[in-house]
C-alpha cells in the first residue's frame, strides 16, 4: 500500500515516466495503424487468387499512358471489354453494354469553378464507357453502382489513378457472376474522368442509370497506401460503412469538409453521381501527392497490399449492400472517423451541434457550482492574478519563440514540408513545451501554487470554450457541412472533464482533510476525531509490539522518546498550529489537490518513496463510531490525493492522440500542395504551427512538474528536429519537386513550338533549363498571380505524324479552321437579332479540342459576361439546312436535339468554353454552330457602353490536344518519342525533379479566328 501511494504521488519522476509511457503508446498505435495493412494479405485461397488476377490486370492496363486523347486509351477499352465478356460469359444473370458500340453521346454544362460566376463550360462527349450488370434476385431493392475510370493523364500510367479501382471492380464482378446478389449491381468502367468527369456524366444517358440509387466510387489521388473513405452522402451511408467494413476501416469526415469548402482543388466522379441524386461512398488513395499524375504512377511505386486494402474495402461494402436492406432514413450530414483502424465512429452533424450546445452550457455550469461551493466554504484564498496570469504569460512567450522559428524556416527552407512535415511539427511542439516548462517551473519555484495544473486546466478549458462557440456557430452556418470540426468538441470535452475532476477533488478534499488550517471550514471536532483515530491505531500497534519484544513500560517510554526527538518522521504527524500558520502565510492558497502531507513539505525527488517513521501515541482512547467515520474519511482523502493521475489520463493521452491523428491526416493529404501555389504554402505552414500548438495543449498544465531530465529530452528533440528542418533538402528522388509540362504549336505565330514549364518558383526551373542541351534562351514570368511561375522556351518540335515532319509549314496541314457561315455583317439580320455562325475545325488524328470565347467586353472569365448563348454540335447534315429551333424536342437542362439530329445547348448566363471530345480518330473534323447576342442589347444594362460592328465580333481561340508521348518515332534516323522536348527534360533533369502534364495532352496546337 505504501509503495502504491509512493508510485502514484504527484512527483516529477512519476509524471515524467507516465508522460514517456503515454507518448510511446501513442506512437506505437500510430505506427501499427499506419503500416498494419502491409501484413494483411489474404490467406484464403479464393481471396489470394482474386488479388493475383487483379494485380495481373493492373500490370496489363498500365503498360502505357492512356489518356482519352491517345490511341492507347482504345487499347485499354478493348482489353476491359474483352475481360468483362470473359467474366460474364457463362453467367445467366449478367450482361454487358458498350457505349462505344451504342454511339452514346451527351452535351452538358459544367459550372465555372474558377471564377465562381454563372458562366459555364459546355462539354460535348462521345462515350466509351464499358458497363456490366448483375441482376439481383430482389427487384424491389434499389440498384448499387460501382464506378472507376480507366483513363489516365497524358504523363501518367494510371496505376493508382485509377487502375486499382478498375481492377478491384473486375475482381468484384468476377465474384458476383458466380454468386447472384439480392440487389442489382451495375459496374461502370468509365472513360475521360481526368478532364471534365465526362464518363460519369455520360452514365446518366444510359438506361441502366434509372435502376440505381447507391454508388461506390473508387478513385486515386495519391500513389498507394491505404484507401480512405473520402466522403459519404449522409449518416445512413456512414453507418452502412461502419457495419460493413469490419476489417481495417479508414475514413475521416475532415476530408469531406475539405470537398464541401473547396479546399481540395480536384473533384472525383462522386460529385457527378451525388448531383444526380445518388447516395454512396467515395473511396480513394490520397498520398503521396507528388507522385500523383506522374510517370511514377506505375506498379513499381505501389504494392499488392495497397491494392488489397482498396479491393477488400470495396468488397466488404458491396457484400453488405448486396444482401441487406439497411435503414437509409437519416439523410443528414455525417461526422465520422476510425479509431486505431479497428472501430468506425459515426455521428450526425446536427447531433454534434446539439452536443456542442449542451457541453458549452453544462461544463461551465459544473465548474461554477464547484467554485460557489468552495467560496461558501471559504476555500478561495489565493492571489488571483498570480494564479491566473502565469499560464497566459508563459504561453505568449513560448509562442513568440515558436513563431520566430516558423519565420526562420519560411526564409531558409520553406518547402521542407513537401518532403517531411513531421519534423517541423515536432520541432515547434517540443520547443513550445520546453519553453513553457522553463517558465512555469521557474515561476513555481519562486511563488509556489499547490495545484497549478488545475488552474491551468480551467484556463485551457475557458479558451477552448470560447473557440468551441465559434466552431459551433460555423457548423450551423455551414448548413452542417463543416463535418471536420469534431476534434474541437473532443478536445474541449476531455480538458473540461480534467478541470472538473481537479476542482471537485480539491474542494471535497479540503473539506475532508483536517490536517491543515489553511483549509478554512474544518471543525475542531474533526481534528480531535482524527487524533483519536491515530491514538487508537497507535495503541494497537504498541500492544502488539510490546507482546513480542519487551515490557510495556519500556516500549511506551521508547515510543514517547522517539516522538519527542523525531516528530517529523511520523506518517500521520499533525503539525503544530504555529507551523500550520507559517506554511499558510508562505504559500498562496487555492482550492487544490495535495497529498495527505501537502501544505507542510512538498514532495521532491529527495523525498523518500516510503516513509519509515514511527507512529506517534495519543493518550486518549477513541470510540468505535468515531474511528470508523474517520477511517472512511482517511480513505476518501487518500483517493482524492491522486487526482493528478486521473486528470493526466483523461486529458493528455486522448487529446494528444486525436490531435495528432487529425493533424497527420490533414498534412499527409495537403503538405505537397505547397508546390502548387502560395495559398497552399500558407495553408500548410499555418496548419503546422496551429497543429503543433494544439498538440502541446494537453501537456501544458503539467509542464511545471516535469523532471529536468524530461525537460532536457524536449530540448534535445527541439534542437534536433529544428536543425533538420532548416538544413534538410526539400526535394529528393523519393519526394521530388513536380513541374508541369505543355508544348504548344501556335499557328498564328509562324508555327512556333513553345515549351511551357509551370512550377512554384522560377528559381527551381532556371537551373534545370540551364542544363538542357537544346535550350539556348528562355523566359520566366509570374503566372496566375498565386506564386506559380511559368518558363517558356523554343523546344524541339513534336513528331506526332510521320507524314508531316519535314517543315514547320506542314503544321498548317494538321489543323485548319473554316468559317462556314457568319451573319454578323449580313443585311438580312436586324441589329437586335442574335448573331449566328458555323465553324469547321479540320484536325488530324485528334480526339480533343477546346474553344474559348472572347469579345471587346468579355475576355474569358476575367471580365464581363460572355455574349455566347447557344452552341450546336453539327453532325453529318449540310450546314445550310440546319435551323436551330427550341420546339423540335423538349429541352432538358438547356439541352435539346433538332429534327436533323444536331445537339444544342443553350445557357442564357453566358457560355465561356466549349470542350469537344470525339472517339473516331479518322473523322478529321468538328462542325459547330454558335449563337451570341449583339452588344446593342447590353445598353440596357450599362448606358455608358457604346456599340459598333467591331464590338459584336466574337473571338474564338481553338486549341486541340494530343495525349500520347511514349510512342516510338524516328527523327533524323534516330529513335525518339513523339515529344522529344519532354523526353529531353526527363533525361537531363536532376533526380529530384518529376514532370506532370498541364493540360489534356502533352502537345497542343492553337489557332485564333474572329467571327
Curated annotation (Swiss-Prot):
It is an enzyme of class 3 (hydrolase). The record marks 292 as: Transition state stabilizer. Residues 1-14, 374-390, 442-451, 509-647, 703-708 are cytoplasmic. The keyword Zinc applies. Its EC number is 3.4.-.-. The keyword Ubl conjugation does not apply. It is a multi-pass membrane protein. The chain crosses the membrane at residues 15-35, 353-373, 391-411, 421-441, 452-472, 488-508, 648-668, 682-702, 709-729. Keywords: Glycoprotein, Hydrolase, Membrane, Metal-binding, Metalloprotease, Protease, Transmembrane, Transmembrane helix, Vacuole, Zinc. One of its GO terms (molecular function) is metalloexopeptidase activity. Zn(2+) 2 binds at residues 161, 194, 293. Binds 2 Zn(2+) ions per subunit. Its cofactor is Zn(2+). Residues 542-567 have a biased composition (Basic residues). Residues 534-585 are annotated as: Disordered. One of its GO terms (cellular component) is fungal-type vacuole membrane. Its main location: membrane. It is found in: Vacuole membrane. It comes from the Eukaryota. Belongs to the peptidase M28 family. This is Vacuolar membrane protease. It comes from Eremothecium gossypii (strain ATCC 10895 / CBS 109.51 / FGSC 9923 / NRRL Y-1056) (Yeast).
Amino acid at each position: 500500500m505504501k509503495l502504491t501511494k509512493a508510485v502514484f504521488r504527484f512527483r516529477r519522476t512519476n509524471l515524467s515516466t507516465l508522460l514517456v509511457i503515454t507518448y510511446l503508446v501513442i506512437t506505437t498505435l500510430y505506427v501499427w495503424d499506419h503500416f498494419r495493412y502491409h501484413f494483411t494479405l489474404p490467406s484464403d485461397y479464393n481471396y489470394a487468387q482474386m488479388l493475383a488476377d487483379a494485380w495481373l490486370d493492373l500490370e496489363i492496363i498500365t503498360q502505357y499512358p492512356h489518356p482519352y486523347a491517345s490511341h492507347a486509351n482504345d487499347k485499354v477499352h478493348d482489353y476491359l471489354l474483352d475481360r468483362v465478356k470473359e467474366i460474364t460469359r457463362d453467367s445467366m444473370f449478367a450482361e454487358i453494354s458498350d457505349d462505344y458500340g451504342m454511339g452514346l453521346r451527351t452535351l452538358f454544362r459544367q459550372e465555372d469553378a474558377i471564377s465562381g460566376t454563372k458562366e459555364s463550360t459546355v462539354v460535348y462527349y462521345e462515350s466509351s464507357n464499358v458497363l456490366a450488370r448483375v441482376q439481383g434476385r430482389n427487384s424491389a431493392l434499389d440498384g448499387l453502382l460501382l464506378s472507376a475510370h480507366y483513363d489516365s493523364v497524358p504523363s501518367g500510367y494510371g496505376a493508382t489513378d485509377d487502375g486499382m479501382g478498375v481492377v478491384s471492380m473486375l475482381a468484384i464482378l468476377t465474384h458476383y457472376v458466380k454468386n447472384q446478389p439480392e440487389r442489382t449491381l451495375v459496374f461502370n468502367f468509365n472513360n475521360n474522368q481526368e478532364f471534365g468527369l465526362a464518363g460519369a456524366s455520360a452514365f446518366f444517358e444510359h438506361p441502366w442509370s434509372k435502376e440505381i440509387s447507391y454508388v461506390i466510387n473508387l478513385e486515386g489521388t495519391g500513389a498507394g497506401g491505404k484507401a480512405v473513405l473520402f466522403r459519404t452522402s449522409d449518416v445512413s451511408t456512414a453507418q452502412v460503412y461502419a457495419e460493413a467494413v469490419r476489417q481495417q476501416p479508414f475514413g475521416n469526415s475532415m476530408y469531406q469538409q475539405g470537398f464541401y469548402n473547396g479546399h481540395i482543388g480536384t473533384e472525383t466522379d462522386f460529385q457527378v453521381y451525388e448531383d444526380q441524386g445518388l447516395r454512396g461512398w467515395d473511396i480513394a488513395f490520397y498520398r503521396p501527392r507528388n507522385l500523383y499524375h506522374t510517370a511514377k504512377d506505375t506498379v513499381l511505386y505501389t504494392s499488392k497490399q495497397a491494392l488489397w486494402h482498396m479491393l477488400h474495402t470495396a468488397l466488404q461494402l458491396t457484400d453488405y449492400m448486396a444482401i441487406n436492406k439497411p435503414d437509409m432514413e437519416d439523410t443528414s450530414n455525417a461526422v465520422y472517423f476510425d479509431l486505431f483502424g479497428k472501430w468506425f465512429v459515426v455521428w450526425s452533424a446536427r447531433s454534434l451541434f446539439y452536443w456542442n450546445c449542451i457541453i458549452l452550457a453544462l461544463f461551465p455550469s459544473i465548474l461554477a457550482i464547484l467554485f460557489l461551493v468552495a467560496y461558501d466554504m471559504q476555500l478561495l484564498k489565493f492571489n488571483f492574478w498570480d494564479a491566473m496570469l502565469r499560464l497566459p504569460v508563459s504561453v505568449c512567450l513560448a509562442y513568440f519563440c515558436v513563431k520566430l522559428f516558423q519565420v526562420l524556416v519560411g526564409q531558409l527552407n520553406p518547402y521542407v514540408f513537401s518532403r517531411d512535415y513531421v519534423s517541423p511539427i515536432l520541432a515547434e511542439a517540443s520547443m513550445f513545451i520546453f519553453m513553457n516548462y522553463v517558465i512555469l517551473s521557474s515561476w513555481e519555484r519562486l511563488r509556489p501554487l499547490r495545484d497549478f495544473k488545475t488552474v491551468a486546466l480551467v484556463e485551457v478549458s475557458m479558451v477552448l470554450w470560447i473557440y468551441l462557440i465559434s466552431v459551433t456557430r460555423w457548423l450551423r452556418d455551414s448548413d452542417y457541412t463543416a463535418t471536420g470540426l469534431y476534434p474541437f468538441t473532443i478536445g474541449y470535452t476531455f480538458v473540461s472533464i480534467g478541470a472538473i475532476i481537479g476542482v471537485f477533488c480539491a474542494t471535497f478534499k479540503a473539506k475532508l482533510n483536517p490536517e491543515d488550517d489553511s483549509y478554512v471550514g474544518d471543525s475542531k471536532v474533526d481534528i480531535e476525531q482524527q487524533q483519536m483515530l491515530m491514538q487508537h491505531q497507535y495503541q494497537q500497534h504498541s500492544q502488539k509490539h510490546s507482546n513480542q519484544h519487551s515490557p510495556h513500560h519500556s516500549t511506551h517510554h521508547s515510543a514517547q522518546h522517539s516522538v519527542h526527538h523525531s516528530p517529523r518522521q511520523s506518517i500521520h504527524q499533525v503539525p503544530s498550529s504555529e507551523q500550520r500558520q507559517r506554511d499558510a502565510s508562505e504559500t498562496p492558497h487555492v482550492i487544490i489537490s495535495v497529498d495527505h502531507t501537502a501544505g507542510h513539505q512538498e514532495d521532491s525527488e529527495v523525498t523518500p518513496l516510503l516513509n519509515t517513521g514511527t507512529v506517534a501515541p495519543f493518550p486518549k482512547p477513541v470510540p468505535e463510531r468515531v474511528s470508523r467515520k474517520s477511517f472512511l474519511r482517511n480513505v476518501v482523502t487518500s483517493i482524492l490525493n491522486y487526482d493528478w493521475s486521473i486528470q493526466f489520463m483523461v486529458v493528455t493521452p486522448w487529446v494528444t492522440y486525436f490531435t495528432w491523428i487529425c493533424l497527420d491526416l490533414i498534412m499527409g493529404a495537403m503538405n505537397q500542395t505547397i508546390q502548387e501555389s502560395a495559398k497552399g504554402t500558407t495553408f500548410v505552414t499555418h496548419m503546422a504551427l496551429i497543429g503543433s500548438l494544439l498538440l502541446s495543449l494537453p501537456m501544458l498544465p503539467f509542464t511545471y512538474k516535469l523532471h529536468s531530465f524530461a525537460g532536457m529530452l524536449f530540448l534535445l528533440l527541439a534542437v534536433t528536429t529544428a536543425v533538420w528542418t532548416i538544413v534538410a533538402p526539400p526535394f529528393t528522388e523519393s519526394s521530388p519537386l513536380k513541374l508541369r509540362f505543355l508544348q504548344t504549336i501556335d499557328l498564328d505565330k509562324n508555327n512556333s513550338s513553345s515549351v511551357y514549364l509551370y512550377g512554384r518558383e522560377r528559381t527551381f526551373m532556371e537551373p534545370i533549363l540551364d542544363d538542357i542541351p537544346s535550350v539556348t534562351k528562355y523566359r520566366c514570368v509570374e503566372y496566375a498571380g498565386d506564386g506559380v511561375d511559368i518558363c517558356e522556351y523554343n523546344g524541339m518540335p513534336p513528331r506526332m505524324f510521320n507524314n508531316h515532319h519535314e517543315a514547320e509549314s506542314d503544321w498548317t496541314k494538321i489543323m485548319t479552321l473554316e468559317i462556314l457561315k457568319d451573319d454578323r455583317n449580313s443585311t438580312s439580320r436586324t441589329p437586335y437579332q442574335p448573331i449566328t455562325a458555323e465553324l469547321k475545325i479540320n484536325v488530324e488524328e485528334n480526339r480533343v479540342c477546346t474553344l474559348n470565347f472572347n469579345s471587346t467586353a468579355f475576355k474569358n472569365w476575367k471580365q464581363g459576361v460572355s455574349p455566347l448563348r447557344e452552341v450546336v454540335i453539327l453532325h453529318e447534315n449540310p450546314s445550310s439546312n440546319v435551323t436551330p429551333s427550341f420546339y423540335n424536342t423538349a429541352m432538358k437542362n438547356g439541352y435539346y436535339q433538332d429534327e436533323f439530329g444536331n445537339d444544342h445547348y443553350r445557357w442564357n448566363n453566358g457560355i465561356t468554353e466549349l470542350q469537344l471530345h470525339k472517339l473516331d480518330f479518322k473523322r478529321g473534323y468538328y462542325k459547330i454552330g454558335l449563337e451570341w447576342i449583339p452588344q446593342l442589347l447590353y445598353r440596357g444594362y450599362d448606358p455608358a457602353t457604346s456599340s459598333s460592328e467591331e464590338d459584336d465580333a466574337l473571338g474564338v481561340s481553338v486549341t486541340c490536344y494530343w495525349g500520347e508521348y511514349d510512342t516510338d518515332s524516328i527523327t533524323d534516323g534516330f529513335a525518339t518519342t513523339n515529344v522529344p522536348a519532354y523526353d529531353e527534360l526527363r533525361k537531363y533533369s536532376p533526380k529530384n525533379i518529376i514532370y506532370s502534364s498541364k493540360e489534356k495532352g502533352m502537345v497542343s496546337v492553337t489557332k485564333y479566328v474572329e467571327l
